[in-house]
Amino acid sequence: VDLMEKNTKQMLQLVNQILDFRKIQNGKMRLHVSLFNLNEMVDSFEKEFRVMAEENEVSFTFQLAGEDIMVWADKEKVAIVIRNIISNAFKFTPAGGNIYVTMGVSDDDRHCYVRVEDSGVGIPQSKLSEIFERFSQADNARGAYYQGTGIGLALSKEIISLHHGEIYAESPEGKGAVFTIELQLGKEHYKPSEVDFYMGGETVSVPEAESVSASAGKESEESDFATDDDDDF
């Protein structure tokens, strides 16, 4: 029963990823951007993956930021990306290995980051530029661990790009891999032509970038952004 539930969950996840990827390709992906605590999200993943770490006999270390990191982003979509990256680290790290998750804010306070490092086999340098492409597979000694559609990393890159952020991988071959997710702080980077501002259950048009910046002082209020597209695809 557990195996059946696991396979069903994986299949559903794959279907959802394919649908999301198609929405992005067609320019129909909606972002529901709200202000949330990135520390709390990352901390929830520590609890979620702790059991897996024990089952796989992998050392799992989390280092949260010293202060709360409040970020304007699509919470659900960002969670998908972070979960994908941590899941990959477990997938490619053998028993006795190590996985480190760290986060923080850049020195210039312009963006925040979540970094996932593993001690697995790593990724060939020739493949680093390809792993974020759809259906890409890394070809190395543990190639069996890289089988699959490859859509997870491709979807992750597209989601982060919609947020005007970056995601990239580094890997000294044979020494594991490091994936870094960067999100800009604030909300001025969201284009007014692409964003609607939700406040108090009402939709307010944001025609100018200054309007977005001016509302930054209200970040403590419950607010949302959404791209100005419908959900159809």
Where are these regions (language model features)?
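Conserved catalytic submotifs in the C-terminal HATPase_c
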Residues: 32-37, 54, 59-69
